[in-house]
Amino acid sequence: MDIRLDSRRAIQAGPLVTTGRIAGAALRMARPFLGIARRLQFKAKAFELALRSVALQLMNDAMADADEAMEETEEDADALGGPRQEVRAVSDGTIVTEREMTCPQNRYCHECSWTGAAAGQNVAAKGAGAAVPGPNRRTGSGERRGYG
């Protein structure tokens, strides 16, 4: 048995060298895949940017459509000559106008027949208490805080 050959192999096959060889072989085998991964990563980034661009464009279009619809609604209200009333849908499906939203009872309902100036009599007649005409006194606007 030739000691040189065995010792050379033993030296070359030491733990660090073996690890280095394995790592080198793994890198050599993975090199084509790393190139593909880099190209795919670049393509994924470009795809992500394209998706963001499309999403941003869709959002801008939707905002423009919403603004246009609001302007048309305001023009229709002006053409009818009536006061502008913001109309909103409540979670149970009923439609409530701004006047109903400013009910002093802070309710999104038709219980008290809130009709602005005549609301005091309507609310008192139903025994719900005195009404305060005008905007909602609790929130300072027509916005609601709860379901009342």
Swiss-Prot record:
Q: Which UniProt keywords apply?
A: Nodulation
Low complexity biased stretches: 124-136
* Magnesium found in the keyword field: no
Q: Bias category Acidic residues: which stretches?
A: 66-78
What intrachain disulfides are recorded? none
Q: Which domain of life is it from?
A: Bacteria
Region Disordered: list its residue ranges: 66-93, 124-148
Relate the induction remark in this record.
Answer: By plant 4',7-dihydroxy-isoflavone or derivatives.
Q: Does the keyword NAD apply?
A: no
Role summary: Involved in efficiency of soybean nodulation and in nodulation delay.
> What protein name does the entry list?
Nodulation protein NolJ
- Gene symbol here is nolJ
